[in-house]
């Protein structure tokens, strides 16, 4: 089954690679229109997936990731239209020049070929990834989680209908519809056809892909994100950022999980933090130094464990730790962070500069919420993933991250001496 999917995807990638920007944009506009026109089919499938997920005891955070409604589906379609408006990187000449040999040489952006994406209960990923891959002339094989297989299958059928309307093979976007986990292992070995693999899920999935895949893997998306609260902050401004970073969408991988607070402001900041978190419905998990102070406030608070520092809450829960200085804060991030998104709230330029230079994350913020680590927010359009590694891409992966390059040389019957 997967061998045939791989063959078909590779063949489709050759046809996609020579489409003009205008042709790709017309195709994407049709996909966006069909997603809205056929929304009833997708939403009905999603309701079935949601019913099964609730019956199986899925957490509220994961249910939120899984759920689609007309508003979210319209937002997904609008994201596809936004991809149409983005500059096409394919064919762009990165650099080049005339050589002493007489050759005129250039380095030109080209599609990767076939991209494989493994993801969990995120039906929006199906469309986001497909639109970015099509814009860059790549075919894609999608393997969503068993929780979303009906939603994904319905969505891909709509996309394939749009492909056929434009004379593009349906195999340009394929979904592995079976929830059988053995098919994941088979996909990991499909290096004859698949050029890059992107897992979007938990640590277990990332570990499996790194250890078992014969395809180059881009890992990321696990977000144990921190905010360091410096002694020089303005209290109300800091609380506003913290609430946004935690509450706007707690199930997102760029939501904050741990606050590191300069102990010098504990007596004034922790009572205010407790009051605001109680107001927002956010539970706190405190270290031994902050726990007694926080227990005097109205927020729900319990003792934090070492394991909780290492995991994503993806819910209205927030770790709190007092640190003696910025050095201790940076050391904690190095020990427990996932190199996703980390922020400092400060009015001290020296501290901001040091944090930016010493925290080795894919996105580092000064006086801003971690929630901005997103392809759309960064002006990249929909993202295929957020990479926390350093090769071949880092941070939100937009269009350029789905390309590679080739060297093209032009001669005049030129030979090497």
UniProtKB/Swiss-Prot annotation:
Keyword Disulfide bond annotated: no
Keywords, comma-separated and alphabetical: Amino-acid biosynthesis, Cytoplasm, NADP, Oxidoreductase, Proline biosynthesis
Gene Ontology BP terms: L-proline biosynthetic process
UniProt-recorded Gene Ontology molecular function terms: glutamate-5-semialdehyde dehydrogenase activity; NADP binding
Any one annotated GO CC term: cytoplasm
Location(s) in or outside the cell: Cytoplasm
Top-rank taxon, per record: Bacteria
Pathway(s) it belongs to: Amino-acid biosynthesis; L-proline biosynthesis; L-glutamate 5-semialdehyde from L-glutamate: step 2/2
Enzyme class at the top of the EC tree: oxidoreductase
NCBIfam families: PRK00197.1, proA
PANTHER family hit by this protein: DELTA-1-PYRROLINE-5-CARBOXYLATE SYNTHASE, GLUTAMATE SEMIALDEHYDE DEHYDROGENASE
Biological role: Catalyzes the NADPH-dependent reduction of L-glutamate 5-phosphate into L-glutamate 5-semialdehyde and phosphate. The product spontaneously undergoes cyclization to form 1-pyrroline-5-carboxylate.
Family label: Belongs to the gamma-glutamyl phosphate reductase family.
Protein name as it appears in the record: Gamma-glutamyl phosphate reductase
Natural source organism: Erwinia tasmaniensis (strain DSM 17950 / CFBP 7177 / CIP 109463 / NCPPB 4357 / Et1/99)
Encoding gene (name): proA
């Amino acid at each position: 089954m997967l061998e045939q999917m791989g063959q078909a995807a590779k063949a489709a990638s050759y046809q996609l690679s020579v489409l003009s920007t205008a042709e790709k944009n017309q195709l994407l506009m049709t996909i966006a229109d069909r997603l809205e026109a056929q929304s009833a089919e997708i939403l009905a499938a999603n309701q079935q997936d949601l019913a099964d997920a609730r019956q199986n005891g899925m957490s509220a955070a994961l249910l939120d990731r899984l759920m689609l409604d007309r508003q979210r589906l319209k937002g997904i379609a609008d994201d596809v239209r936004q991809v149409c408006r983005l500059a096409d990187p394919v064919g762009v000449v990165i650099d080049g020049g005339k050589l002493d040999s007489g050759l005129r040489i250039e380095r030109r952006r080209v599609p990767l070929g076939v991209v494989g994406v493994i993801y969990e209960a995120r039906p929006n990923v199906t469309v986001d990834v497909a639109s970015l891959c099509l814009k860059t002339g790549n075919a894609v094989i999608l393997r969503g989680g068993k929780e979303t297989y009906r939603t994904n299958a319905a969505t891909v059928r709509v996309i394939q209908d749009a492909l056929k309307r434009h004379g593009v093979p349906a195999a340009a976007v394929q979904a592995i519809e079976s929830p059988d986990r053995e098919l994941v292992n088979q996909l990991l070995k499909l290096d004859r056809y698949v050029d890059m693999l992107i897992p979007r899920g938990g640590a277990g999935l990332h570990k499996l892909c790194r250890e078992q895949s014969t395809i180059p893997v881009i890992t990321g998306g696990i977000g144990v994100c921190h905010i360091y609260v410096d002694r020089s902050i303005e209290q109300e401004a800091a609380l506003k950022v913290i609430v946004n970073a935690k509450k706007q969408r707690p199930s997102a991988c760029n939501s904050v999980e741990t606050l590191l607070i300069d102990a010098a402001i504990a007596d004034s900041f922790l009572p205010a933090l407790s009051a605001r978190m109680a107001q927002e419905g956010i539970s706190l998990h405190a270290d031994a130094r902050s726990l007694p102070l926080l227990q005097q406030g109205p927020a729900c608070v319990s003792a934090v464990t070492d394991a909780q520092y290492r995991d994503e809450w993806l819910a209205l829960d927030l770790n709190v730790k007092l640190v003696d200085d910025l050095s201790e804060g940076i050391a904690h991030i190095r020990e427990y962070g996932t190199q996703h998104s980390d922020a400092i709230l400060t009015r001290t330029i020296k501290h901001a500069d040091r944090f930016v230079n010493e925290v080795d994350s894919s996105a580092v913020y000064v006086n801003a919420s971690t929630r901005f680590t997103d392809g759309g927010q960064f002006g990249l359009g929909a993202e295929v993933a957020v990479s926390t590694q350093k090769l071949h891409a880092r941070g939100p992966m937009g269009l350029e991250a789905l390309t590679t390059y080739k060297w093209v040389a032009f001669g005049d019957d030129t030979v090497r001496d």
